[in-house]
């Protein structure tokens, strides 16, 4: 969430920067008047409280002196009623301001290319060698069904479309990747956690999923607690420290979390709905960092390298792109996408994102640090990154490591986890 005072004091530049997202933010022009009305109400309330306190003292003094308190008590009651009315007005005014700020996205970083969608993202560099096949490569669905390691038909019988049953070496490959990723990031100083998969409304708001993306997540409607299914480990992991204040010498705090994620994926169509590229339920390894504001972009660059290491060790060809302003996530100031080359698409496809939300999520979650320079509490910066999406990594391995006979060579780094060098 953006800071109200900052938005009001810098309104033209804030709107100009936000409109690089190719959206209309004219509604923010309401904020200066709302902020002024709020300020006036606060002053009136402060004055009335002072009058009410003075009146209460007079009541006490007259009562102690055994004088008639009828008129003074009547004045006190009038002041109390007026105060309650003003406090209700203030509550409504603050809710109006809150509603505006809660749907307003983060300010994009100045380094981002200006654009309308992912077509305007900027390729930064490529890594790894794209394989030249001596045969026509198959897509992961064909390969997996021939090997009987992914079962879409039975998953559909259980749950409907957008689900899969991993079986045999398919299940073992998924598990091996999770273990490999968790081990790798753990060695790099990320503390391993397994958070809850059922999440409350406050947690979903804190990371920016609500209210904007209500239609993209799963809500447990029989719950009295406004519970949601985990859409990404980013949500529960960040909320570990909601309403907390860090000591500065503890930063950065780094977590790696493995969870199953659940998303509606509304509006998905075309080739992406074939196979496991876009699922309602999928496994993901997520990286989270709570950083000092002064070095959060250095931490972001290091997190990118940490995510890249997974692809490098798996020897998968990939590229890094910088997201344009039009493709940038709601809560993020800057995002790098990792895209792996998929032979069936003959192009690079997203396998992970690494982002800096600056203090946007920290403000919503009220996560701060004590600044020793001035002894004041300041919002930390929060980073999140994929480390990686497990299902899409399975796709990349099946397609890039396929053999002409339909078998799959297991990447060398996974062989100790899987206990074999070939899937057949």
Swiss-Prot record:
MF GO annotations: ATP binding; serine-tRNA ligase activity
Reaction equations catalysed: tRNA(Ser) + L-serine + ATP = L-seryl-tRNA(Ser) + AMP + diphosphate + H(+); tRNA(Sec) + L-serine + ATP = L-seryl-tRNA(Sec) + AMP + diphosphate + H(+)
Gene3D superfamilies on file: Bira Bifunctional Protein, Domain 2 (3.30.930.10), Serine-tRNA synthetase, tRNA binding domain (1.10.287.40)
Matches recorded under InterPro entries: aa-tRNA-synt_IIb, aa-tRNA-synth_II, aa-tRNA-synth_II/BPL/LPL, Ser-tRNA-ligase_type_1, Ser-tRNA-synth_1_N, SerRS_1_N_sf, SerRS_core, tRNA-bd_arm
Binding site for ATP: 263-265, 350-353
Enzyme class: ligase
GO annotation, cellular component aspect: cytoplasm
Binding site for L-serine: 232-234, 286, 386
Record pathway: Aminoacyl-tRNA biosynthesis; selenocysteinyl-tRNA(Sec) biosynthesis; L-seryl-tRNA(Sec) from L-serine and tRNA(Sec): step 1/1
PROSITE patterns (alphabetical): AA_TRNA_LIGASE_II (PS50862)
HAMAP family xref list: Ser_tRNA_synth_type1
Domains (record comment): Consists of two distinct domains, a catalytic core and a N-terminal extension that is involved in tRNA binding.
Protein name: Serine--tRNA ligase
Biological source species: Onion yellows phytoplasma (strain OY-M)
